[in-house]
């Protein structure tokens, strides 16, 4: 860790860049990284400063000093090129949970999208994005479906929960919001599923928890980079919740949602391969999903989805005739 900048009296911003000494399978990394974060947090307490962690990432391909390949300057994530992309999502998420549990105020992953820098800049190839920027592939990387859940539910102005576990290979963290809703993420580093009973102390549990799953052996990918839907509703039995966490996976449990069916999209019209529709007027609307079927009564599914967009039109590259449906997706993922 090294200091990059200081903003105001209350903050200290640092980055961790690469953790080149740790592979994705390293089971001690969580403990070591949490200790480093705790050291900085405690160092700043006497000065009444908060710690913001910026630009954190995993091991760099070619390592430092070996990133000039055939005259091309490269800065790329090792896991994206060594077959460990899906599994390494566990490590990047436990890195974030370690920071939360150590008292880090906020953090920023390196990076949201690949940077294909112009030739005159220092790096001509920068591949760290949750989204690819490539001539043949602009899709999401597997990390999006893991780290993206933390971004959605470990949100601004939430407060970290105190979480204890006797299992060294279960790494967890959570937050509670001002309205009493809460979210808990659990990373299972075991090679087998684990049954867990979670005791909820001083938390409201008057509605079922939505369970979101990132399984590194079966990544819930979307052609359109949509975050996965929740796969289970888990009722609270008193102050306890029972959950199964599959091997090498991440489970996120949350009550931070409103159970709501977005209003139907109207005015759908298809002409010469372009579909248009009336804009949603709901305050919590976020984007649209477009579907195409063979009959007017087809059922929208992940398999027949043809687009995700914030626009109110879509031009279908497939000239084949068909029927279209459009759904609104809201802030809680309802559609």
Regions found by a protein language model. Name each.
Residues 58-172, 177-181:
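Aromatic/acidic polysaccharide-binding cleft in carbohydrate-active enzymes
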Residues 228-260, 324:
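C-terminal beta-strand-rich structural cap/linker in extracellular carbohydrate-active enzymes
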Residues 280-302:
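Solvent-exposed loop/turn segments flanking beta-strands in beta-repeat/beta-sandwich domains
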Residues 316-334:
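Beta-strand-rich modules
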Residues 1-13:
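Single conserved hydrophobic/aromatic residue that forms the stacking wall/gate
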Residues 18-72:
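Glycoside hydrolase catalytic-domain groove-lining segments
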Residues 166-216, 248-254:
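Carbohydrate-binding surface patches
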Residues 257-284, 330-335:
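Pro/Thr/Ser/Gly-rich low-complexity, intrinsically disordered linker/stalk tracts
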């Amino acid at each position: 860790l090294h200091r990059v900048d200081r903003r105001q009296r209350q903050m200290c911003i640092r980055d961790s860049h690469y953790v080149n000494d740790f592979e994705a399978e390293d089971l001690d990394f969580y403990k070591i990284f949490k200790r480093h974060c705790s050291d900085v947090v405690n160092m700043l307490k006497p000065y009444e400063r908060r710690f913001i962690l910026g630009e954190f990432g995993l091991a760099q391909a070619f390592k430092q000093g070996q990133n000039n390949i055939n005259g091309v300057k490269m800065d790329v994530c090792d896991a994206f090129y060594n077959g460990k992309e899906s599994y390494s999502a566990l490590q990047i998420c436990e890195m974030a949970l370690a920071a939360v549990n150590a008292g880090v105020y906020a953090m920023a992953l390196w990076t949201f999208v690949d940077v294909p820098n112009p030739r005159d800049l220092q790096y001509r190839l920068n591949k760290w994005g949750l989204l690819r920027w490539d001539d043949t592939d602009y899709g999401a990387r597997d990390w999006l479906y893991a780290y993206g859940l933390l971004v959605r539910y470990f949100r601004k102005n939430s407060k970290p929960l105190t979480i204890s576990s006797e299992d060294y290979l279960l790494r967890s963290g959570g937050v509670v919001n001002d309205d009493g809703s809460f979210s808990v993420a659990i990373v299972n580093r075991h090679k087998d599923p684990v049954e867990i009973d979670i005791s909820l102390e001083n938390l409201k549990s008057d509605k079922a928890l939505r369970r979101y799953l990132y399984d590194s052996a079966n990544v819930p990918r979307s052609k359109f980079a949509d975050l996965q839907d929740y796969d289970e509703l888990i009722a609270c039995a008193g102050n306890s919740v029972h959950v199964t966490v599959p091997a090498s996976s991440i489970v996120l449990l949350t009550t931070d949602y409103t159970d709501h069916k977005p209003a139907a999209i109207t005015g759908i019209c298809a002409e010469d391969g372009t579909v248009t529709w009336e804009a949603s007027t709901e305050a919590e609307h976020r984007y649209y999903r477009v579907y195409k079927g063979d009959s007017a009564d087809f059922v929208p599914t992940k398999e027949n989805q043809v687009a995700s967009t914030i626009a109110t039109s879509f031009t279908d590259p497939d000239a084949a005739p068909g029927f279209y449906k459009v759904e609104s997706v809201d802030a809680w993922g309802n559609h």
